[in-house]
Amino acid sequence: GQHPSGIGAKSDHGVTGLALLAFLGAGNTHREGPYAGSVARGIATLTAAQRADGSLARNAEFFAALYCHGMATIAVAECLAMSGDKALEPALERAIRHTVAMQHPQTGGWRYAPGDRGDTSQLGWQVMALFSARNAGLRGCEPAEARAL
């Protein structure tokens, strides 16, 4: 359960992303499968609340925001890759632009704010978001991937 202090209360888009990955991993998309309705609602929730800067973290706390963004971005990318629904491309493109903007320009890592030296937990989520976006057909992820690796 949630910590009594409320820690994690504003990480709903990260949790939604993770739940979507479970549905997607079982073969469901927002168009097909016994849980298509659930996937459709989850994807709509993530994309409808996308911030102007491209973040999919919605109202996540500072230290949770980039984690939530990465999880949600992976879910959108995987849904696009599985369904071929081009309507998801603009949201994914904005999300990846945010991912790249948050990357440290020299070390290639991610942390909590632009320019922060990276840590491995953030690196994993953001690199997976880049790989998933590339696998979904998004072009231009390679320079950020190369900086990270």
Question: What is the predicted role of each segment?
Answer:
Residues G1-L149:
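Preference for long, amphipathic alpha-helical scaffolds in soluble/luminal domains
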